[in-house]
Amino acid sequence: MEELQSFLEKDRSWXQHFLYPLLFQEYIYVFAHDHGLNGSIFYEPVNFLGYDKKSSAVLVKRLIIRMYQQNHLICSFNESNRNRFVGHNYYSYFYSLMISEGVSLIVEIPFSLQLKSSIEEIHNLRSIHSIFPFLEDKLSXLNYLXDILIPHPIHMXILVQILQSRSPDAPSLHFLRLFLHQYHNWNSLITPKKSISVISKENKRLFXXLYNSYISECEFLLVFLRKQSSYLPLTSSGVFLERTYYYGKIQRILVWQNFFQKTLWVFKDPXMHYVRYQGKVILGSKGTNFLMKKWKFYFVNLWQYYFHFWSQPCRIHINQLSNYSFYFLGYFSNVLKNPLSVRNQMLENSFLMDTLTKKFDTLVPVIPLISSLSKAKFCTVSGHPISKPIWTDLSDCDIINRFGRICRNLSHYHSGSSKKQSLYRIKYILRLSCARTLARKHKSTVRIFMQRVSSGLLEEFFTEEERVLSLIFPQTTFFSLRGSQRERIWYLDIIRINDLVTNF
């Protein structure tokens, strides 16, 4: 129990900051505008009403004055609900957007202070591709994989409570709770059907800050339990069970004790690996199916009794890795088994020995990529290329550069695939869509347009990355879509997923 308490204090000591006074400082809203995820929201509404940038600064000062008067602030929220699009009452809606960005920035400050101290040490590991070499080394030795869809709390107040456990700044949290309560009553922040699942574009930053605190709390408890499980051979089960009391409220102690009295001791697993991405979690283990069911049982009860919301067990799928292909960060990944027969010679006798090797394999998901291209209006649902009418107002060079950039980015991101033949079809769709767009702009057919221009017009921008790779590896292999179908390259400069990859 003392060990858990010290673990809690050490992990949460960084949160001893009182940030509420920052809400009444003008420079906070300037920072939120300059560095926010949606920096343009400060000027789009006022420009719509004819205000200039100087007038927006005046509105910030008016907002700070209103924030000193809590009742007036609540009235302004209600007023914005009734008059969002009526004349000059639109400034109330503008106030709500500024508060959302300002609160988001303040909530992010403690997390950014914690992240800044460690980000330089893991600079190379920031690349998305750095995960795949790790999976190549580890997954081939595992037996089971749990695919977990992280549930969302059904109410925003749960996220605020989670944030409260990490920050003693009660005034800021009280203001945030008041803001969310008032904002919940109208549709600009959250739809009335679900209070958290659908967030409008201008409030993604606030939701992301609250959601990250929730994920951080989940992983904090998981890391603690994982660390303690390694000491189980040296600790009696009775003493270890006392530590689970901290996971729930006082009234939940007996429930938690009954749930975990016969399960915690089987959590010993020296080869468990955890990867989180896009609201999902991959939990790999070298243990048995029974052990994975115990972890599933733990997650379901963690969400129910610690975070106080129900999570369906069907959100956690346990699969045997040798018979399972999973979608992960734009790839279909699986573990291939390759049986080998080796002839051994001992003196005058020889015999055959059968061995089994495992290899982590990554494939390009063609059908989902075509679906993404279809949603982006580059082709039909069946993969037939079509023109991009909204780009016909651009110059020919801009059109070619846009199509070429998309193709190069997809090739760059999927360079780790062992079978790149699938990219030929994606390249064909983008190339023909580019030709159709140019032909439409010049009011011609694709055949006539291609006869007029040089044959290398559409070939140049697709081969730029291949030329770069040939300079990096001049004496080894010629890396291209044709010459490196089985060569896998993982880059350290990919810090985000291509939009087309995440569009399905």
UniProtKB/Swiss-Prot annotation:
The primary location reported for this protein is plastid
InterPro entries, A to Z:
Domain_X, Maturase_MatK, Maturase_MatK_N
Which GO molecular function terms does the record list?
Answer: RNA binding
Q: Name one GO biological process term.
A: mRNA processing
What is the protein's name according to its record?
Maturase K
Q: What does this protein do?
A: Usually encoded in the trnK tRNA gene intron. Probably assists in splicing its own and other chloroplast group II introns.
For whether the record's keyword set contains Plastid, the answer is yes
Instruction: State the GO CC annotations.
Output: chloroplast
Which keywords fit this entry according to its UniProt record?
A: Chloroplast, mRNA processing, Plastid, RNA-binding, tRNA processing
Q: Which family does it belong to?
A: Belongs to the intron maturase 2 family. MatK subfamily.
Does rRNA-binding count among this protein's keywords?
Answer: no
Q: Where in the cell is it found?
A: Plastid, Chloroplast
